[in-house]
A protein has these predicted regions:
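A short, structured loop/turn motif at beta-sheet edges
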Residues: 67, 101, 132-136
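Short coil/turn motif common to extracellular beta-sandwich-like domains
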Residues: 68-78
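Extended low-complexity, serine/threonine- and proline-enriched intrinsically disordered segments
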Residues: 78-110
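N-terminal prepro-regions of secreted/extracellular proteins
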Residues: 1-70
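Tryptophan-centered short beta-strand motifs
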Residues: 30-32, 41, 105-115, 155-158
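Short, solvent-exposed, Trp/other aromatic-anchored flexible loops in extracytoplasmic proteins
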Residues: 110-149
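Short beta-strand elements
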Residues: 152-167
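Low-complexity repeat regions of mature extracellularly deployed or surface/particle-associated proteins
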Residues: 59-63, 75-77, 141-144
Length: 167
């Protein structure tokens, strides 16, 4: 799946915003901090029915059995209006970024795309990254969502961006 120019621009803005918000203090362990608990509310109408949702992104780290740090990024879609958002009308993406212990900017490590739980029809995206060489000092994730307004496959612009960090 390719990102639209609008998503790419919004993702770049999210990188800059998160870079300015994330404290770079060194710590012995990782802990999760939600900078924004939910993305902005979005609504749309399909075939005369109104739907609304927000997205929530989070990043967490665990230690693998080999002692490596593994970062997990998730972005979930939450229905706001009491109707299930049609799964064919929404795409969700999660992007996991990392910053080197040597400094510099955040770098995109991994991207996860829309997954639909077949039992609950919950819409989410997930991805992970294992720090093989103990080089990453902090991580953050950005969640993106797009909606389709009609039966045509032209997707609207980016809806919500939400950032969580870990350092």
């Amino acid at each position: 799946m390719k990102m639209t120019k609008r998503i790419a621009a919004m993702a770049a803005c999210a990188v800059m915003a998160a870079s300015s918000m994330v404290g770079m203090s060194a710590s012995a362990g990782f802990s999760s901090t939600m900078l924004e608990p939910n993305g902005s509310y979005e609504s749309f109408t399909v075939d005369g029915v109104n739907y609304g949702f927000q997205i929530r992104s989070e990043v967490e780290t665990t230690t693998t059995s080999s002692g490596k740090t593994k970062a997990n990024s998730q972005t979930y879609l939450h229905e706001v209006v009491q109707r299930k958002v049609p799964t064919s009308n929404v795409k969700v993406q999660t992007q996991l970024y990392g910053k080197s212990k040597k400094g510099g900017n955040y770098t995109l490590l991994s991207v996860g795309y829309t997954t639909i739980d077949s039992n609950t029809t919950r819409i989410y995206a997930t991805t992970s990254w294992i720090d093989q060489y103990d080089e990453i000092s902090s991580y953050y994730t950005t969640g993106l969502a797009e909606k389709r307004l009609s039966s045509y496959y032209s997707w609207s612009n980016l809806l919500s961006v939400n950032t969580s960090s870990i350092s």
